[in-house]
Amino acid sequence: MAALSWQGIVAVTFTALAFVVMAADWVGPDITFTVLLAFLTAFDGQIVTVAKAAAGYGNTGLLTVVFLYWVAEGITQTGGLELIMNYVLGRSRSVHWALVRSMFPVMVLSAFLNNTPCVTFMIPILISWGRRCGVPIKKLLIPLSYAAVLGGTCTSIGTSTNLVIVGLQDARYAKSKQVDQAKFQIFDIAPYGVPYALWGFVFILLAQGFLLPGNSSRYAKDLLLAVRVLPSSSVVKKKLKDSGLLQQNGFDVTAIYRNGQLIKISDPSIVLDGGDILYVSGELDVVEFVGEEYGLALVNQEQELAAERPFGSGEEAVFSANGAAPYHKLVQAKLSKTSDLIGRTVREVSWQGRFGLIPVAIQRGNGREDGRLSDVVLAAGDVLLLDTTPFYDEDREDIKTNFDGKLHAVKDGAAKEFVIGVKVKKSAEVVGKTVSAAGLRGIPGLFVLSVDHADGTSVDSSDYLYKIQPDDTIWIAADVAAVGFLSKFPGLELVQQEQVDKTGTSILYRHLVQAAVSHKGPLVGKTVRDVRFRTLYNAAVVAVHRENARIPLKVQDIVLQGGDVLLISCHTNWADEHRHDKSFVLVQPVPDSSPPKRSRMIIGVLLATGMVLTQIIGGLKNKEYIHLWPCAVLTAALMLLTGCMNADQTRKAIMWDVYLTIAAAFGVSAALEGTGVAAKFANAIISIGKGAGGTGAALIAIYIATALLSELLTNNAAGAIMYPIAAIAGDALKITPKDTSVAIMLGASAGFVNPFSYQTNLMVYAAGNYSVREFAIVGAPFQVWLMIVAGFILVYRNQWHQVWIVSWICTAGIVLLPALYFLLPTRIQIKIDGFFERIAAVLNPKAALERRRSLRRQVSHTRTDDSGSSGSPLPAPKIVA
């Protein structure tokens, strides 16, 4: 075959450079592809004409993608899906059943709705549900993204990629004799996509024990931390072995400090008391979560030292919860080899004076025995977690000379925090449940302060056994994101809801705004009630944030100060109208803060269902009654008319970066096809097919090439670039156009290893605080597994009925596997556990080591119990100051 022309060389060279730019994340794919396309059209039409380059912007598949965002926004704004999913999820204590309950409904849902909004509204639901059920969040969020992707492969409208390929195929074969064979109906991909999704689901269920991460952090692990037992904690007066603390993974109690003595844990029968300081080895995220569940407060080194003093500020003052958070802003630092702190104990260092920092935890090891944080002798390479004070400056010379590199931010406890009250409705599901069981503990950015009864009495937040009653008012410290979560929580309404309703603003145009009070403005020194805020501004103050303080007053009684940040419920135009108001120095709308229009929930769901039914009926009768593009537009228009969403929300729902990426990628693929580059790559696939003696091998090659490209680019771009290559190869090998397109659809959705390869991956990556390594540990074997699955499906595509039957039977068996497992003899269970432990040791050695340590600790505690120990601790040495 002739060599590439200069046009082909230019096209492939600059396309490859664009791939490098996108893979390195230097510039986004929307800008990269748009600039690349403009460059390729600059050669007077010799590479690609302007008409062909612009054709993608009006492609019907792309237009369908764009306007389905409108429909998804309409459903999301009604809150209907959240209500349904909360009901479907129910309650589960095991990771296996939690995954079954969470993944399967999402797979079904994402088959008919765009997976991005599905994941958007499911993330806070799953976080709350996981905390409520005691299931690690990290076990749920990666499977959530994968479930949304897998479900999208079951119908032609399930993902934007599918719609893009459908649009490209319609355009390519519009005037061909194969037009009928090429026309996609909604379920034409189902014979391949459903088994593909089921086997992906099976893999996650089988691998969750040794591949999915638990509650872990991206930062230092195996830390020595201190927590204080609050007087009202559920563990007070309980033996350590009966408290539930020993059963918590990643939370290992090593010692107790009580009455001036450090007691090493040699006997789990020791009885815990209020005020005890427990020394724990584990990870910060896990310790914080367990602390919230059991009533334990994180202790820094200054509080640890204060607890030694019998008089002074007083224990309750030291551990009071009046501060805005248990810490201000945590940073991680590594002690340099040249540090003058080496050889000194933590207590001997003037941390605040020299660095503006307070030690919170130190990584264990360096040959030291576990003890108190203050008594740890510092060594080179020690990793510390430190809380920042107002005097902290990362550019201090002392910090640069004593620590390696830059101090890394770990957690921000100083994000704007508002004290907000929510009232419990009589019919709320949370009635009769503890705060934890109701799903209000462990939510990022949310902390329950107290509960007020209707009779005027109050319950402190540390009463972990209290069960919520109708008409209770729950006072919560929450950041802006958590306030949005509360506004959509079923059965709860804001205490200020009456004031909000009196503004007269329709719920359709209501949202939240943050406004900072001017130091010289007319609001300073007055209460919200005094200034008649609602009357003057036609808006209601929902909550107030004050730097470094929680204001224990109702909103209308707070005396405002300069710098206070008001959280205001108002009309969508309010921020623009008051941006230059002298009362405020900054006015900023809160994104996605519109309350759910629950009264329109049924209308929104019915309209979306009707849209899907038009496609299903058309597919069953092999007749297109209405194209999905105008159908989506009309559905969204009806949602607008019926008040499911407003016009601004409709406009903002469209993800223009996705539109630009896909449209420009169409033009680039046209350039690759027109210059012969696509044919060159297609010939390689044709050779594979002929060499392997069948079309199945060619389809597998198409799938693998698209999947690998999807890890580097966005899924839509990968599909658009691969389509002309695959279509040429398919036509040459006499493969039906639908089979070729299905291979691309499945491959383009297979971005599982890289968290940046797929939008839903990126969303759960941030929400779950995963590391790239954790994603790759799950995603790499998952990718290989699905390559094998896709190979079988594509090779045996003509026997899809048998593939379906086998897939469903195997899936049912795996779902019921835990029940079958416990019917096996113990010796067989031990062998099975050992087999999976060996696999885990190879794939994730650190996690396997931690599990073995945990098991040894539990066995050790059990043996101690059986020895008949009295429960009295051995005499412990006094702490040497």
UniProtKB/Swiss-Prot annotation:
Domain (RCK C-terminal): residue spans on this chain: 212-296, 318-402, 407-492, 498-584
Keyword DNA repair assigned: no
Membrane topology: Multi-pass membrane protein
Keyword flag Membrane: yes
UniProt cross-references to InterPro entries, sorted A to Z: Cit_transptr-like_dom (IPR004680), DASS-Related_Transporters (IPR051679), RCK_C (IPR006037), RCK_C_sf (IPR036721)
Phenotype of null mutants: No effect on sulfate uptake, due to the redundancy with SLT2 and SULTR2. Slt1 and slt2, as well as slt1 and sultr2 double mutants show a 50% decline in uptake while the slt1, slt2 and sultr2 triple mutant exhibits no increase in sulfate uptake capacity when deprived of sulfur.
Parts forming coiled coils: none
Annotated source species: Chlamydomonas reinhardtii
Name the record gives this protein: Sodium/sulfate cotransporter 1
GO CC aspect terms: plasma membrane
